[in-house]
């Protein structure tokens, strides 16, 4: 199965001209990169149409957020139907920056996941601990509790059917303390947390779901560490943040992944 490369542009770039220049970098490494990986781009909503027009290869279009209702007056929000009409397939849900800066609650995250599933959109749920757990390969109680609580709230009232070649959602393990800091989680420690998430999934949804649901790593992914994370059989891909809109770093990532070295 192909691994996932998810590129979260956040609030970048600053204008459409810069966006087109950035998308040329992605196009320049296709189809090599899309033959090896499932590649999804998550530009700001204002750039979704322009991104769709400028992406000719098999790139997947994603959005950074969604509102949880289709038919309600909510100024400034984007509904699932709107995103569907633009060809969006993936939606990032519960990113720590939204939890922190916009006070997005666990209840809202649960509503958004349900809205995605009800509208044939794939939610990409982000979970992770606030503080660096330095206890080694066995996550400490605080970390376990924090991640289990996020999962319990996110999947409240949600049923997932046994997969027929895959599932219609994915999870990103993103240690909050590593986001944007230039320091990623240790690979073995990341694998331990991902194993913990799979354990929770097996208890909640069964072994088949736990085995097939994609779990990715996110948090200061760059050209120096991306191959290490992708080499792990326990990690199904990566969510790339700051490096997504740095053309030099992006080129280094693609060179790492498209050359045999």
What are these regions (language model features)?
Residues 1-161, 166-261:
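Active-site loop-to-helix "anion-binding N-cap" substructures in soluble metabolic enzymes
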């Amino acid at each position: 199965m192909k691994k996932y490369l998810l590129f979260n542009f956040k609030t970048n770039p600053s204008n459409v001209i810069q966006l087109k220049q950035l998308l040329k970098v992605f196009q320049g490494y296709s189809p090599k990169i899309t033959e090896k990986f499932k590649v999804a781009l998550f530009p700001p909503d204002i750039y979704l149409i322009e991104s769709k027009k400028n992406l000719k290869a098999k790139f997947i279009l994603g959005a950074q957020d969604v509102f949880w209702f289709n038919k309600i007056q909510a100024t400034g929000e984007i509904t699932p139907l709107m995103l569907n009409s633009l060809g969006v397939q993936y939606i990032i849900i519960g990113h720590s920056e939204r939890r922190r800066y916009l006070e997005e609650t666990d209840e809202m995250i649960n509503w958004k996941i349900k809205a995605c599933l009800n509208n044939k959109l794939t939610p990409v749920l982000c979970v992770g601990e606030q503080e660096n757990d330095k206890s080694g390969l066995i996550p400490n109680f605080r970390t376990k509790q924090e991640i289990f609580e996020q999962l319990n709230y996110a999947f409240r009232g949600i049923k997932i059917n046994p997969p027929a070649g895959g599932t219609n959602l994915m999870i990103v393990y993103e240690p909050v303390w590593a986001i944007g800091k230039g320091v990623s989680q240790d690979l073995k420690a990341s694998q331990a947390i991902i194993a913990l998430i799979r354990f929770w999934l097996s208890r909640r949804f069964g072994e088949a779901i736990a085995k097939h649901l994609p779990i990715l790593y996110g948090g200061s992914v760059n050209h120096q560490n991306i191959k290490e994370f992708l080499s792990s059989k326990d990690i199904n891909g990566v969510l790339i943040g700051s490096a997504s809109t740095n053309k030099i770093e992006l080129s280094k990532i693609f060179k790492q992944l498209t050359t045999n070295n």
